[in-house]
């Protein structure tokens, strides 16, 4: 069993499902609102490891969907500066277990890292609202 520090956007359906899967797998989850953290470039950077910069950005963020932010055009410092100012741009969830940190919820990677139960909950990485105009009920206009 792992103690998972889990940064989410409350009301996000996938974050809710991801936490439920972690708990069902025997892990303890300490959830925090990603928007309420005092992020800096230095505190954010370790969560992204060697992932390409474009994968650091939440593709369902309103500014990405509107074309205002183009993840593939950003370098590391630009991406970090944008995410520090607008936490909705951060790919969720951010998770930490001990000194190991990661972003997103690739089920196979999380299973290899801390272990998950065998049930298949379906796609819990891609925002189900991304292909529609649906907004999460928790906060209109926020992804």
UniProtKB/Swiss-Prot annotation:
InterPro entries: Arsenate_reductase-like, Nase-assoc, Thioredoxin-like_sf. Belongs to the ArsC family. CDD domains: ArsC_15kD. This is Uncharacterized 15.7 kDa protein in draG 3'region. It comes from Rhodospirillum rubrum. The active site is at residue 12.
């Amino acid at each position: 069993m792992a103690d998972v520090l889990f940064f989410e956007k409350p009301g996000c359906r996938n974050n809710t499902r991801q936490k439920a899967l972690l708990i069902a797998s025997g892990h303890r989850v300490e959830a925090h609102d990603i928007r309420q953290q005092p992020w800096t470039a230095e505190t954010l950077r370790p969560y992204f490891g060697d992932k390409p910069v474009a994968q650091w950005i939440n593709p369902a963020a309103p500014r990405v969907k509107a074309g205002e932010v183009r993840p593939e055009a950003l370098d590391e410092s630009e991406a970090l500066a944008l995410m520090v100012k607008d936490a909705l741009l951060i790919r969720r969830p951010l998770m930490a277990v001990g000194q190991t940190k990661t972003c997103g919820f690739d089920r196979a990677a999380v299973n290899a890292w801390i272990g998950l139960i065998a049930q298949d909950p379906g796609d819990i990485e891609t925002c189900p609202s991304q292909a529609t105009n649906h907004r999460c009920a928790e906060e209109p206009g926020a992804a």
